[in-house]
Amino acid sequence: MEHLNKKEEICRKVAESFRFAGKITKMSPYGSGHINDTFMLTCELEDGSNKHYILQRMNDDIFRNPKELMENVVNVTTFLRKKIIAAGGDPERETLNIILTKDGASYLQDETGDYWRSYVFIDDATCFDLVEKPEDFYNSAVAFGHFQQLLADYPAATLHETIKNFHNTVDRFHNFLKAVEEDVVGRAKDVQAEIEFVKAREADCHIICDALANGEIPLRVTHNDTKINNVLIDAATGKGICVIDLDTVMPGLSAYDFGDSIRTGANDCAEDEPDQSKVHFDLHLYEVFAKGYLSTAGASMSPAEKKSLAWGAKLMTLECGIRFLTDYLEGDHYFHTARPDHNLDRARTQFTLVRQMEEVFDQMLEIVS
């Protein structure tokens, strides 16, 4: 509790530097995120009503350049706000709104060197951690597709690449080969089947990257963390209203965002399921998501880019499995593990999903065409 009070004390001091409306009457830890320290602030306005804000300490161990990160967030949200207003929407609820410091900056560096930023809290909205019913997955797809559509004419190349080669599957494959060759903890001999599974799909790793290099698909502004809980759902309508957590917004491909949503949402198992007989790729949920995503993003996409979405589903799943297996071979240094072979179980789950996607891949292509 002392540690929590210390955090709140620091947070209160930091809050004095931001342009909040009204007087701060309450401050409490908020959410279950593991990367940033997040607090909700309640401010009482002159008319007696309350306004809520989010105040966050950014984790610069993960995001090494908070300045570039916040430049991306400011530029993208400013662009989105203009688009939403032009379309007659509600910019206070349909995009994140940054609260500036009293010096007019988008973030604050405190006396200890930590970086802080603040957003207006969007009231009367919620989010889901899991796909509980197809309608939820559809609504998240509509929201992510709308996000892509609004940013279709944003100059993606002008954004900072805040995490280098984040979804470069070719680079991930090369890192994997290096881990196999060095075999620093002597595990390679026990996972030959998994190693051969990845090696057999080397050509697949190049497909999306080559399509971009050849000009077949465009560079886009991508979210890069398209889990269902990064869409706020309006409490009254049940519809997705706002895409949140823009820390990984940077140049990328629509296939990345589409594919990561499918990887995390179109199955009925835990990411670290040790029993592979319980792992099932759900083609129906894939179709539900594709329908929602294309209903909003499809108008700005060429046939080649739509086709790349199916490849994105397979390759984001394969890439994630490669990362888990690479970490396992290197001694479990990157991903937190709770048991022996935890990363191996994670890798096997992703590879099982890839196999099942391959069995229905023609249907996956047809659905997005």
Predicted features along the sequence, with ranges:
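Juxta-kinase regulatory segment immediately upstream of eukaryotic protein kinase catalytic domains
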Residues: M1-S28
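ATP-dependent phospho-/nucleotidyl transfer catalytic cores
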Residues: E2, A21, S28-S32, Q56-R57, ...
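Conserved ATP-binding subdomain of kinase catalytic cores across diverse folds
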Residues: K26-Y30, H34-E44, S49-K178, G252-S254, ...
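Conserved active-site aspartate in kinases
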Residues: D245
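Active-site activation/catalytic loop segments of kinase-like enzymes and analogous catalytic loops
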Residues: A255-A299, L315-Y334
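Small/polar glycine-rich anion-binding or flexible loop at a beta-alpha turn
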Residues: K306-M316
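Long, compositionally biased intrinsically disordered regions
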Residues: M357-V360
